[in-house]
Amino acid sequence: MKRSISVDSSSPKNVFNPETPNGFDDSVYLNFTSMHSIQPILSRIRELAAITIPKERVPRLCWFKQLLELQAPPEMQRNELPFSVYLISGNAGSGKSTCIQTLNEAIDCIITGSTRVAAQNVHAKLSTAYASRPINTIFHEFGFRGNHIQAQLGRYAYNWTTTPPSIEDLQKRDIVYYWEVLIDITKRVFQMGDDGRGGTSTFKTLWAIERLLNKPTGSMSGTAFIACGSLPAFTRSNVIVIDEAGLLGRHILTAVVYCWWLLNAIYQSPQYINGRKPVIVCVGSPTQTDSLESHFQHDMQRSHVTPSENILTYIICNQTLRQYTNISHNWAIFINNKRCQEDDFGNLLKTLEYGLPITEAHARLVDTFVVPASYINNPANLPGWTRLYSSHKEVSAYMSKLHAHLKLSKNDHFSVFALPTYTFIRLTAFDEYRKLTGQPGLSVEHWIRANSGRLHNYSQSRDHDMGTVKYETHSNRDLIVARTDITYVLNTLVVVTTRLRKLVIGFSGTFQSFAKVLRDDSFVKARGETSIEYAYRFLSNLIFGGLINFYNFLLNKNLHPDKVSLAYKRLAALTLELLSGTNKTPLHEAAVNGAGAGIDCDGAATSADKAFCFTKAPESKVTASIPEDPDDVIFTALNDEVIDLVYCQYEFSYPKSSNEVHAQFLLMKAIYDGRYAILAELFESSFTTAPFSAYVDNVNFNGSELLIGNVRGGLLSLALQTDTYTLLGYTFAPVPVFVEELTRKKLYRETTEMLYALHVPLMVLQDQHGFVSIVNANVCEFTESIEDAELAMATTVDYGLSSKLAMTIARSQGLSLEKVAICFTADKLRLNSVYVAMSRTVSSRFLKMNLNPLRERYEKSAEISDHILAALRDPNVHVVY
């Protein structure tokens, strides 16, 4: 598709123009990632954001305060919370993320994701062009906190009496349903307002200053976020973008609108004073996503998971909401899959996405992907492929079979190892839980089994190959410790299930891959959340320690001797040129000329009778004359003809100022690039693809365990759910920063002491760029909400990892997988799940499945598909190809 520079005259961005009164034009030039078809989307969202409503329709602060006094939530007074919606839907790879990127650059808006994974995916997309501020989940932005996770939803219900219901009825139903969360947020916001915390008086102060200076009302409001960084994002803009909105239940739409009005009313923001209303931009695919709600029944000790209407389906299908939001004029559909390069396969995916008529040609195409289920379930087949299953039970069964196969095959590269996970249960809290739930006979063992999916990440607790649980009672500590071992496979791909701290300690790859990292600054850009100085200092440390790899490469006996000799001379000459302040001492002359004179680190050649010849093994009479100085002893042990002059002439330090840090990095980078160019010219691919590794200290792998003396000089960062890692093993090396983080968690004192004593191992992962990190353990507290009581029940310790060797179809959504083998369950086929599974790969050459779902009985999302087909024919709906 042709890309163009788009211009829109309504943007507030500034481009200098001497003809305008203030010297700036109000037009904006979008970058090359924007398409011509996205311009109408920008214009329409700006129009919606600029709409003002009459003062009588603006929700009053007193209405929110009245809610705090209600005894029965269904008795709350109905009140409209005005809002607008713009819907952006489309199939996988159609350009929705590019549209979000353009919105972020052209409009002052709040970008969010429905989940942490969605938020991190958006952040990764936005960071490709410019440094992006952190992207939070929509829950974080509207005030959802950890204590709301166990809130009982649907405790109260409201039933309207008129049909069809009004928008006020729909909003009241959602507020009553989500009451426990919203009322807690409301209490907290009013407390902040009463205490003057969180910058609640910032805008009022600016109004007063404007009056004193006789400035127009609102002219200084733009400085509020400079004066107070703790202001909620909702007070900054009324345009809220939610990526992957199809994963959210319908009540979240009202929750976002409710909290936007609440926060702006408390803060008395300019957009509240001017009568602006929130514009919720929902991005996602209504046909491939499901919203699920989980209710835990304490009396039965069972989780009840039910599908619920998601936001996108709610907006599209609900007649009242369609009319209120005028959805036909506020809907953009992206329908071209740019990831897939095969016409037939791409057309098949579009057919499944939009519920178009399925033909025999489509079925015959899918026939070519079918192989026996036994072939897919055999771990010896399809190495490197990701298995997708319908249930967690099937995933766990395959992982057990895979581990058994690897143990029998005794494959050193993909060896199997097990590590312990722990759950610490508070005895007093557990006794109180049994009293409140009326279950005096409930055992800890039964409670652990029933709540494993709530204690840990659900996929992690169900998909892993886990051993039997062993229990230890520590009455003097008021604890029961449950331990179970989880089996992992070395050198396989994994993802983290939550955001974890990691300490980057080194790099392992090739000379070429490390040169690429230095060339495009990808490593530095990816660490925008921390000081760039630390990244440069870390890279300088790695380069300095890894320069010896160039000389180690030249020890290869298969290299041409003449080229090796020339390489030594050119490397030494490069060092002479780049190391400032270095003179041509006898040391350099000996190295450049390839002389066999002995060398010491003070730059003087030794006398002939004490010379050590690097080109042949020393004779006994020469060894007898070796000086006793430790440095000289080291160098006389070398049997190469030239040593690396950098380590003799350059003393590596840790500079303090930014200029010195950057200057040191540029010097190290210049040395690496220069050496790389010399050896790449002489030895070509045999050099560029040769292994290169560098660490902050000496490392050694003993099977699956990494041994390292010191992690000083490592770089603290975050392991994100959107990244893919290779599991290199584990380590018991102490990481002081992780110990400090555990102390800051303020866990139950006895639990913390036991954690210190257990000395839990830490995982060692390698990211897709080659950087090796030690990842902190995943320590989480589990608090149970029973009626009005909150019980600190347990603390869990695991590794926060999930394998990419096998997973459920539901969990694969949003992931790009290169090679996919799918095992469908014939009696539970849903067309949207079929689409999700098949669209994880970009090429049909890497797709296998156990049956042809198009020749089986399946469930189809008929209602939403009909609405989308009607929208494609609607001239008011904006279609982007």
Swiss-Prot record:
Associates with the primase and the primase-associated factor to form the helicase-primase complex. Pfam families: Herpes_Helicase (PF02689). It is found in: Host nucleus. InterPro entries: DNA_helicase_dom, HSV_HELI, P-loop_NTPase. ATP binds at G90, N91, A92, G93, S94, G95, K96, S97. Signal peptide: none annotated. It comes from the Viruses. One of its GO terms (molecular function) is helicase activity. Belongs to the herpesviridae helicase family. Its EC number is 3.6.4.-. This is DNA replication helicase. Component of the helicase/primase complex. Unwinds the DNA at the replication forks and generates single-stranded DNA for both leading and lagging strand synthesis. The primase synthesizes short RNA primers on the lagging strand that the polymerase elongates using dNTPs. Possesses helicase-like motifs and therefore may act as the helicase subunit of the complex. One of its GO terms (cellular component) is host cell nucleus. Keywords: ATP-binding, DNA replication, Helicase, Host nucleus, Hydrolase, Nucleotide-binding. One of its GO terms (biological process) is DNA replication. Disulfide bonds: none annotated.
